[in-house]
């Protein structure tokens, strides 16, 4: 494939491309500089190339083809010689170089011959250019293009001087036609396009080094646009078809209405018409019953005639009714025409078009508001709006449209929990601190009953119930029979306590034995104690109702307890260590008392185990209980006493102040 074939093929394809976009080649006045540049790249060479130059180009192609074939033969011979003899390689290479130099000289001579020939210009149609490529490698286009890219890379650039000659044709702007570059030639040759595909080239004309991916992308966009156009056209057609169908439906409905109305009217007329009179059968000829004025010879009256066919007596009123029906039909036709116009253009609608607004503004400039029936004149000019609508539109200039209420978006995500307390002030100021103090006072939980409040307004809580409401009960302590078991238990404890104190210094071994025996006895009796405790718990659960305590009950309990423990234990007769034998019931009662105070102290046996039997502690507890009972009585007596001006209660200050010799002022 020759160099000139590439160039001519590129020009041809570029010529077709521009021909589709610019049909009028000769009209260059209305074109921009960019449009002219495209034309100068393609069309000017065709106008300036002559017929003789075209013939010489054909000869040049034939000569160059023969040279190309000789080069291929020389290369094949050189390859064979290289395999046989290594010494002959240098000679063959020199021969090949000489042959190549000769070919280059021949090419230069051919170019010089083209420059010497100058003839008159002719039209493009008379020019003949061989655009068909010549293949050397069995018709493979890709292999041929690779050869020319490698071998003839320097010679593809062809100037316009070699093909066209001088002088150039200049434009008014002084724009010269630039030559075709190597990239443009390779692009136009590689693109084998038809006239329908030239719209795609617009994207690649300026930048030829685009990738195949971008080309496919551009083609897809081009196809999408075509699909969108087709869809839009189909939608328009569908809308037109729907409009036609609606019109046909309306016509049919109108025709049906008219037919129904006609039938109804005919039925009504038949019902309203009176029965027609009949003449006598004897008079079958026309008769005249009118009064004739003899003076004027004019007929004044009604002419009655008789139909022989139907025997009906007819007047001239039927013709008038027919005329009225025709007039009504014409009125209906006019109304139907107006309905069609109303369907197409929404008459008396609240929406205003630009034409209606312009008409309204035109008349308002001509008329004055003081004119009679001002808005009626405006509506008459607008034609599609009433006077009220025109006035409403004019007054709407001063009104701002309402903004649509934005709906709150319901967020699916859980929001940040906010506190119900709103604090707008700065918390570091005095006002903010006061606000915080109020909030804390309101939010912090308080007790319902304030025990330390000395005022009467607060509700008091009675921790001990009044004596009137107490259920009277018998003194349970007096009726109890402790029996001999409890006395034996008290004596046994004291005996053990004294024995251990006497024998500490004399016999250590005996102490150990006694301790072991006591421990064993205690361990054996724990089981009995547990059984007794379980029985006591069951009895307590059965008696769920709590017994209320009376003052007499406390006093009797104190007397019995003081009289029982005031007696001293009997003296010890023997000093020797003896193991006292006690019954199981006495040991169980002892261990019941033991468990309340010494659950974990098994090793401290030498200590006195029972603090309840101390006389001093028992007296103190009795005194406290007696004070409580006496104060309860005093409190009930003072409930109805008067309150001081300050509202303070004397009870919380220890009764009357006069007893202590103190005044109210000193208390404060």
UniProtKB/Swiss-Prot annotation:
Q: Which GO terms describe its molecular function?
A: histone acetyltransferase activity
Quote the biased-composition stretches of kind Low complexity, using this chain's numbering: 69-121, 293-307, 501-542
Checking PROSITE patterns in the record gives: MYB_LIKE
Residue ranges for the region (Disordered) are 57-124, 246-357, 403-432, 497-546, 561-583, 631-668
All copies of domain Myb-like, residue ranges:
344-398
- The annotated regions of Acidic residues compositional bias extend over 308-318, 642-651
Q: Biased composition, Basic and acidic residues: where in the chain? A: 246-268, 319-335, 632-641
Which segments does the entry list as coiled coil? none
Q: Which Gene3D superfamilies match?
A: Homeodomain-like
Protein name stated in the entry: Myb-like protein W
Provenance organism: Dictyostelium discoideum
């Amino acid at each position: 494939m020759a160099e000139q074939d590439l160039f001519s093929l590129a020009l041809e394809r570029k010529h077709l491309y521009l021909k589709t976009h610019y049909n009028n080649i000769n009209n260059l006045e209305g074109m921009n500089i960019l449009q002219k540049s495209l034309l100068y790249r393609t069309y000017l060479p065709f106008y300036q190339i002559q017929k003789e130059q075209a013939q010489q180009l054909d000869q040049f192609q034939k000569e160059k083809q023969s040279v190309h074939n000789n080069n291929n033969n020389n290369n094949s011979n050189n390859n064979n010689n290289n395999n046989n003899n290594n010494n002959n390689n240098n000679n063959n290479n020199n021969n090949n170089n000489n042959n190549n130099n000769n070919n280059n000289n021949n090419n230069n001579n051919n170019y010089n011959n083209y420059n010497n020939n100058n003839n008159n210009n002719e039209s493009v149609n008379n020019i003949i250019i061989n655009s068909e490529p010549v293949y050397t490698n069995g018709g493979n286009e890709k292999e041929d293009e690779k050869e020319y890219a490698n071998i003839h890379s320097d010679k593809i650039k062809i100037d316009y001087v070699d093909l066209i000659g001088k002088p150039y044709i200049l434009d008014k702007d002084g724009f010269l036609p630039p030559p075709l570059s190597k990239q443009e030639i390779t692009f136009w040759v590689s693109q084998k396009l038809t006239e329908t595909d030239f719209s795609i080239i617009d994207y690649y004309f300026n930048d030829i080094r685009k990738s195949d991916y971008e080309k496919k992308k551009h083609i897809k966009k081009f196809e999408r646009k075509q699909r969108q156009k087709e869809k839009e056209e189909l939608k328009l057609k569908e809308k037109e078809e729907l409009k036609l169908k609606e019109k046909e439906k309306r016509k049919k409905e109108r025709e049906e209405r008219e037919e129904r109305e006609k039938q109804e009217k005919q039925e009504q007329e038949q019902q309203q018409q009176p029965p027609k009179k009949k003449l006598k059968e004897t008079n079958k000829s026309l008769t005249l019953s009118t009064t004739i004025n003899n003076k004027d010879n004019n007929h004044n009256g009604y002419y009655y005639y008789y139909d022989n066919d139907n025997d009906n007596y007819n007047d001239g009123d039927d013709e008038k009714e027919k005329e009225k029906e025709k007039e009504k039909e014409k009125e209906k036709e006019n109304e139907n025409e107006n309905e069609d116009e109303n369907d197409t253009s929404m008459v008396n609608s609240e929406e205003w078009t630009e034409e209606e607004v312009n008409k309204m503004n035109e008349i308002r400039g001509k008329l004055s508001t003081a004119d009679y029936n001002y808005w009626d004149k405006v509506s008459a000019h607008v034609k599609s709006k009433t006077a009220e609508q025109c006035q409403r539109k004019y007054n709407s200039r001063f009104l701002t449209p309402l903004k649509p209420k934005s709906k709150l978006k319901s967020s699916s995500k859980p929001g940040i929990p906010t506190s119900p307390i709103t604090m707008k002030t700065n918390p570091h100021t005095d006002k903010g601190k006061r606000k915080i103090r109020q909030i804390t006072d309101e939010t912090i939980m308080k007790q319902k009953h304030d025990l330390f409040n000395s005022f009467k307004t607060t509700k008091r809580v009675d921790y001990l119930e009044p004596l009137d409401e107490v259920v009277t009960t018998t003194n349970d302590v007096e009726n109890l029979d402790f029996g001999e078991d409890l006395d034996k238990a008290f004596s046994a404890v004291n005996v053990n306590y004294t024995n251990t104190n006497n024998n500490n210094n004399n016999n250590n071994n005996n102490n150990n034995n006694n301790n072991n025996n006591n421990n064993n006895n205690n361990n054996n009796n724990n089981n009995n104690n547990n059984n007794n405790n379980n029985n006591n718990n069951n009895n307590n659960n059965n008696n769920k109702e709590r017994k209320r305590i009376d003052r007499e009950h406390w006093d009797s309990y104190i007397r019995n307890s003081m009289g029982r423990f005031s007696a001293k234990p009997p003296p010890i007769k023997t000093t020797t260590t003896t193991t006292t034998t006690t019954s199981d019931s006495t040991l169980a009662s002892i261990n019941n008392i033991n468990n309340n105070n010494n659950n974990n102290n098994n090793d401290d046996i030498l200590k006195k185990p029972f603090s309840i039997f101390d006389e001093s502690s028992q007296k103190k507890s009795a005194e406290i209980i007696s004070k409580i009972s006496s104060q309860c009585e005093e409190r009930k007596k003072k409930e109805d006493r008067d309150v001081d001006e300050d509202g303070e209660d004397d009870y919380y200050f220890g009764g009357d102040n006069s007893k202590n010799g103190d005044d109210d002022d000193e208390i404060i």
